[in-house]
Amino acid sequence: MKLHEHQAKEIFAKYGIPVPEGKVAFSLKEAKEVAEELGEFPLVVKAQIHCGGRGKAGGVKIVKDMDELEKAVESLLGKVLKTFQCPDGKPVNRVLIEKATNIDKEYYLAITLDRSKSKPVIMASAAGGMEIEEIVKENPEAIIIETIDPELGLMPYQARELAFKLNLPVKEFASIALKLYQIYSDLDASLVEINPLVLTKEGNLIALDAKLDIDDNALFRHKDLEEMEDETQLPQLEVEAKKYGLNYIKLNGNIGCMVNGAGLAMATMDIIKLAGGEPANFLDVGGGANVEQIANAFRILMADPDVKAVFINIFGGILRVDRLAQGLIEASKMVELRVPIVARLEGTNVEEGKRMLQESGLNFIIAEDMWDGAKKAVEIANKQS
């Protein structure tokens, strides 16, 4: 789950990480009130969306007076902001108004999980700001990476070593780095990022931007954070799927996937790619896969206009395949299936399950195995496109 910049900065401030003075506004009236409260110009107006690249897309504006502030806010609120990271755009429903910072140099600082090591890492660079992606592509060595022992946490000597390498005030930088790790640990974050961390001309370090992503699997421990989620930033199909209790993530392909089990769902997407296709989603219906759950999954898949074919990949372990087939038949009668359905079934009573689907009179195409199913789904999707 992603938080907005202003939400992340509020958390940073509680932990003692310096952030610019500012406040969020949901309307022009509120923006003017915030400007008056801050009491001086120049101010910075920042669109709040769950996407990077705002600066290059005109989502961050420096204003010198109230007239410029009004124009900036009106140009952002209620609009869709498209960035290179989000070409389809995200709606801007709030803006952050902050005091401008006297920047001397920009840096990068983040903590995330290195899945190859199964350990968190802290990453820092003397090259921060809007160009960080390009800099890392051209010169990966520009990023300094330190592995963190999860049993010990980020050690003070590691934070000091980073400060020395970046030629930054040691005490101040180490304090920020250690507090950033505390946030990462306390909130079960998957990513905490400051880009840029700026050194001001007065010699202070300030988190000019803030990014905080929370592990969805840990949200049961953080109900206060879960309530902060802005669903307007999510694909509406994901919001709908969440109501049904489905694990669904929208992707950019044209082959809808319905699978039981997260591991099999990942393998299904891989084999679709291997067959030359593009998955339209990740969708794990869970181990139960009852009629209602399957019907809801069909509703989500059929609501996606990009979907040209559906690949159902089910392994019946505890769940008998004949019962699952009956569930598929009943669910398909509840939802209009506008595209062909390729089904690969395996497990207990699989032959009976296949026979039931073939005799149902519905638009099911039976696959012999995963590879056969993936090839059939790709072929159908290409014909439908």
Swiss-Prot record:
Q: Which Pfam families match?
A: ATP-grasp_2, Ligase_CoA
Gene Ontology molecular function, alphabetical: ATP binding; magnesium ion binding; succinate-CoA ligase (ADP-forming) activity; succinate-CoA ligase (GDP-forming) activity
What is the main EC category here? ligase
- Keyword field contains Cytoplasm: no
The residues that the entry says bind Mg(2+) are: 195, 209
Q: Which PROSITE patterns match?
A: ATP_GRASP (PS50975), SUCCINYL_COA_LIG_3 (PS01217)
Q: Which cofactor does it need?
A: Mg(2+)
Q: Member of which family?
A: Belongs to the succinate/malate CoA ligase beta subunit family.
User: What protein name applies here?
Assistant: Succinate--CoA ligase [ADP-forming] subunit beta
The organism is: Aquifex aeolicus (strain VF5)
Q: Which gene encodes it?
A: sucC
